[in-house]
């Protein structure tokens, strides 16, 4: 740690919040650690403290995002869908969805020990999809859906219901959507 | 599969919902599979379809639970807390909380690839805590908090704020609560 000024406690958390509010794209823990001149672990604890105060920060697969009311307002339509596919079709599935201008807010599976396990992946563009897939492949992380033989839920968000209808139709045609 | 009547599609889902609504305690996938005379995987898909219709079923660490309005009403107070401890203190932490009559609704950590990962463990008694810990040990599942060097969030629910205050005080005295 160089001798540059190290931001301390509450001031640091205020500054983190400011950076996140001003940023147009997600900020990773590493980027925030460098900016605040502290370790990545200190950032994880700081973000946890802010979340414990109900500050609307989410850790997405791309980094931390401040979800203010306006950002949430933009995504008025929301729908939960049930999907079934092998891990090799994850990228295809996500692309079918984002190509309709729809965001995949999360993926939910049933963990045999923990019960419902929800991951806030928050991918809405082809770039974010490929970044997410690359991260999975580079870290050898398992696809969560492998825990339940491919069955999983997604919460989809979009500016309107029509886009979600289109995404569901595309998934159905691809044999990915589980229908009643 | 014996030749007993196998419940089919939508009827089966209606029946699953009825069993869950009537049950005073969580029902496991295995129990529902036996009752409906189908495989466990069929039950996972059925529950996913019901969840996709916003039916308030959650998969907890103890099994499926139907969270009707009354059940949720009973738990009016809710608070997110930030905690830090090693995996060996998980049981102690959960006991400190449930001993105050407080329920641990979930555990949330930051997965390096998936972002926020939330597990609906839903433990509220010493019996449920020991069942959860036994399951982790018997399946060698890692504690989620091990992914973030012990830092994690819990959402606590209880009939009133006072019980949550007491639980937080106990956690603080044990050096588990991360404070501002």
From Swiss-Prot, chains A, B:
Transmembrane segment boundaries: none
Recorded phenotype for the gene knockout or disruption: No visible phenotype when grown in the absence of nicotinic acid.
Keywords: DNA-binding, Repressor, Transcription, Transcription regulation
Alphabetized InterPro entries for the sequence: 3H_dom_sf (IPR035922), 3H_domain (IPR004173), HTH_11 (IPR013196), NadR (IPR026043), WH-like_DNA-bd_sf (IPR036388), WH_DNA-bd_sf (IPR036390)
UniProt GO molecular function: DNA binding; small molecule binding
Family annotation (Pfam families): 3H (PF02829), HTH_11 (PF08279)
Function text: In the presence of nicotinic acid represses transcription of the nadBCA and nifS-nadR operons. Also binds to DNA upstream of the niaP gene, probably regulating it as well. May bind nicotinic acid.
Subunit and partners: Homodimer.
Protein name: Transcription repressor NadR
């Amino acid at each position: 740690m160089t001798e540059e000024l190290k931001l301390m406690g509450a001031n640091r958390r205020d500054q983190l919040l400011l950076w996140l509010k001003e940023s147009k794209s997600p900020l990773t823990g590493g980027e925030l650690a460098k900016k605040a001149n502290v370790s990545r672990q200190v950032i994880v604890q700081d973000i946890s403290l802010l979340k414990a105060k109900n500050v609307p920060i989410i850790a997405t697969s791309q980094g931390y995002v401040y979800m203010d009311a306006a950002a949430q307002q933009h995504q008025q339509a929301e729908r939960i869908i049930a999907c079934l596919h092998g891990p090799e079709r994850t990228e295809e599935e996500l692309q079918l969805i984002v190509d309709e201008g729809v965001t995949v807010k999360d993926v939910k599976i049933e963990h045999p020990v923990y019960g419902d396990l929800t991951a806030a992946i928050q991918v809405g563009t082809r770039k974010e999809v490929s970044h997410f897939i690359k991260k999975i492949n580079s870290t050898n992380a398992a696809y969560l859906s492998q825990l339940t033989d491919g069955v999983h839920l997604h919460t989809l968000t979009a500016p309107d219901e029509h886009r979600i209808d289109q995404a569901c139709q595309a998934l159905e045609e691809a044999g990915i959507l589980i229908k009643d």
